[in-house]
Amino acid sequence: PTGAMEMKSQREIHRVSPVCVIPDLAGEITAALAGTGPALGLGEVRSTSAPSHIALVIGTSGTTGMSKEVAFTASALLASARASNKFLGAQAGQQWSLFLPLTHIAAVNVIIRSMELGTLPIDLREHQGEYPQVDFTSIVPTQLFRALNSDERLLRHLQSAKAVLVGGAALSPALSQQAMTAGINVVETYGMTETSGGCIYNGEAIE
C-alpha cells in the first residue's frame, strides 16, 4: 500500500529541448505550474519522475562541479517571478527579451516573469539583425562586456531597456561603471539555481 501511495504522488518529468520554441515552452510551463501537465526537466536531468508538487527539475553542476538535479515547486517559481517584477516596477503588458540558454533557471525565470505580465519574451538567442526594443532583459557579464566593446546592436538594445539584470557570474566594478556611463540601467543579481536564480538585486533581497 505504501508503495502504491508513493507511485500516486509522483508525476512524469518531460525533458525540454534546449532549442524549444518559446510559445510551446510557455504552454508546457503553464501546465506544469498548474499541475495539469508533467513536470519539466531542463539540462542534464536523468530522473523520469518527481514528487507531484514539483513543477521543474534542472540538472546543474552547481558550484562544486558535481552534477545534481535541483527541483522547484510552482509556488517557488511564481514567487520568484513576482518578486522580480515587483522590484523592477514591471507592469502588465511589458515585455522581456531572452538571451539565456534554456538549461539555466535564469531563462525559465524570464519566461515566467513575462507570463506574469501577460506577455511572452522575445527570443533573441539566435537573433540576426537589429534587436527589437523591450522593457527588461537578463544577461551574464560576458554579454554585457560584448555589448560595451564590440556589439553595437546589443548595446542599443540594453540602453533602451528599463532595467538589465546581470548575473550568473561576478560583475566587476569597472564593467558596471562602464555600463552606467553608457546609459544601461544594470541591476546586479546574485543567486544560485537552488534559490530559484537571483534573489539579491543590487544588494537587496527581493520579496
Residue map of PLM features:
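Carrier-protein-dependent adenylate-forming modules in NRPS/ANL systems
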Residues: 1-48
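AMP-binding/adenylate-forming
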Residues: 2, 72-79, 95-147
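Hydrophobic alpha-helical segments in the ANL/AMP-binding
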Residues: 23-31, 36, 84-85, 103-117
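Conserved pre-ATP/AMP-binding loop-to-beta segment of ANL
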Residues: 40-58, 91-94
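Conserved AMP-binding A3 loop
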Residues: 53-82, 89
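Conserved S/T- and glycine-rich ATP-binding loop of Class I adenylate-forming
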Residues: 60-63, 96, 111, 137, ...
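Glycine-rich helix-loop-beta junction characteristic of Rossmann-like nucleotide cofactor-binding loops
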Residues: 86-90, 155-156
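Gly/Ser/Thr-rich phosphate-binding loop
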Residues: 150-205
